[in-house]
Amino acid sequence: MSSSFGKIFRVSTFGESHGGAVGVILDGCPPKLKIDINLIQNELDRRRPGQSDITTPRNEEDKIEILSGIKEGLTLGTPIAMLVRNKDQRPADYNNMEQVFRPSHADGTYHLKYGIQASSGGGRASARETIGRVAAGAVAKQLLKTFCNTEILSWVKRIHDIDSDINKEKISLKKIDSNIVRCPDEKVSTEMIERIKELKRQGDSCGGVIECLVRNVPSGLGMPVFDKLEADLAKALMSLPATKGFEIGSGFSGTYLKGSEHNDSFIKSDDSSKLRTTSNNSGGIQGGISNGENIEMKIAFKPTATIGKEQKTVNAEGKEVLMKAKGRHDPCVLPRAVPMVDAMVALVLADHLLLNHAQCDLINN
């Protein structure tokens, strides 16, 4: 089972939903980087369960413990080990699901592959695995901010069939976090919250779309062919639980345009290190390499698989059974997935920033 990601800026996550702890080993972070531990904790608080009445009622503090790699606010260049202890597990909620495969959940496929699985809390398939990613991503965000002034902003664009149209020029973290659903449109966010509450009362769930904008992206990140920047971003984001789709730039809507309509024309720039364009249908990446424009992406999340309605399924013996899930689950994963998206984008960009310096700086400088 692969639990590691990245080439130079490399993360390895560990732990399970109902185990003793979850965490991450971050290797390859440059030394002497100033790290604000509070910013790491802030990101974990944004993904923490029990933060509102539209998320899972599981109540975890998710307090970060730094075990190694950071001393007096500076990175040492050695592996950074970070840990969060699980304190509010209820494995008894899963007794009736021990050998029953939840529809559209990882239970069945894990059993087919390994012949054994940690059914309690979903094990490694649980979103608690992403705690390590978010902690490491918070370090990556500080690296990107320090060296490039890069800003990563993600927000909930759509919940179920309730969509928003956000002005990307005016988007800010303050606006995103101004409500519990993390949609920076006050009117639409109210509708989204009511829809989630309604589905929660019905024992059901919903999915939606998260949009991500990256500002102040260095040009030259990414490589041709197999290590294209958008390919690595897609892999990173599609590795998150419940993801089912990825778009960059114009995405699928670009297929309705002609080449003359879709092409991003280059224009003169005062900064010779960047290529400015009149439009951004490419989403800031061309030929697999960043051009310096904003990176714009959308990520689709399916409805939460574990719901409170009775469903038909089979057990490990292949017998048909009826099941109604217990446990504490998000009726919609998107509000808490926003910092997860931020984290994975930050990890990819930090890794490619270091790769670009390793390959090109000796010659270009």
From Swiss-Prot:
Gene3D superfamilies cross-referenced by the UniProt entry: Chorismate synthase AroC (3.60.150.10)
**Cofactor note from UniProt?**
Reduced FMN (FMNH(2)).
Q: Which cofactor does it need?
A: FMNH2
Reaction catalysed by this enzyme = 5-O-(1-carboxyvinyl)-3-phosphoshikimate = chorismate + phosphate
Q: Which GO terms describe its cellular component?
A: cytosol
Write out the GO biological process terms. amino acid biosynthetic process; aromatic amino acid family biosynthetic process; chorismate biosynthetic process
The record, for InterPro entries, names:
Chorismate_synth, Chorismate_synth_AroC_sf, Chorismate_synthase_CS
UniProt pathway annotation: Metabolic intermediate biosynthesis; chorismate biosynthesis; chorismate from D-erythrose 4-phosphate and phosphoenolpyruvate: step 7/7
Annotated stretches, region: Disordered: 266-290
Keywords, comma-separated and alphabetical: Amino-acid biosynthesis, Aromatic amino acid biosynthesis, FAD, Flavoprotein, FMN, Lyase, NADP
Sites where the protein binds NADP(+): 47
EC assignment: the record states 4.2.3.5
Residue positions annotated to bind FMN are 124-126, 287, 302-306, 328
Recorded superkingdom: Bacteria
Q: Looking at the keywords, is Amino-acid biosynthesis present?
A: yes
Q: What class of enzyme is it?
A: lyase
Question: In the UniProt record, does the keyword Isomerase occur?
Answer: no
Q: What GO molecular function terms would the record report? A: chorismate synthase activity; FMN binding
Relate the assembly described in the record.
Homotetramer.
Please report which protein family the annotation says this sequence is part of: Belongs to the chorismate synthase family.
Described function: This reaction introduces a second double bond into the aromatic ring system.
**What NCBIfam families does the record tag this protein with?**
aroC, PRK05382.1
What's the protein here called? Chorismate synthase
Tell me the organism.
Answer: Prochlorococcus marinus (strain MIT 9301)
* Protein encoded by which gene: aroC
